[in-house]
UniProtKB/Swiss-Prot annotation:
It holds the Pfam family Ribosomal_L13. PROSITE patterns: RIBOSOMAL_L13. The keyword Coiled coil does not apply. It comes from Borrelia garinii subsp. bavariensis (strain ATCC BAA-2496 / DSM 23469 / PBi) (Borreliella bavariensis). This is Large ribosomal subunit protein uL13.
Amino acid sequence: MKKITNNVTIWIKPKTVEKKWYLIDAADRVLGKVAVDVVRILRGKHKAYYTPHQDLGDNVIIINASKVRLTGKKHQQKLYYRHSRYPGGLYSDTFKTLSERKPCAPLEIAIKGMLPKGPLGRDLFRNLKVFSGSEHTLKAQNPIKLEANLREVK
């Protein structure tokens, strides 16, 4: 008869994980598809030891956020709402006006909406750096450039 042993589940601690930096060019890519790929990397779902309640994901740098595109007529019809917290203080912007005022905001809003709500989501969002132009200030991190098919990240 075999001796029965207790199997122990090993939990990876966030401090022991070495975070990589990825560079994504958002020029001429659909807003939602870029956001889905970025959130997957931020959460760490591309890793074998993914755990939903820990920050085991990597850091992401997005360039050319102002050149992201939308399908259909969403450029004029998509609305973004914000409130001043005063009575009657609801404001709305279209994608076009918001991207003229803050070029990185539509992509950041889409990514933030896909992350978990709460302290973990706020920590994950801090791992994201978005730049409207083609230059970024994080060259010292030696980011790995990802091409169009981001679902193949290992």
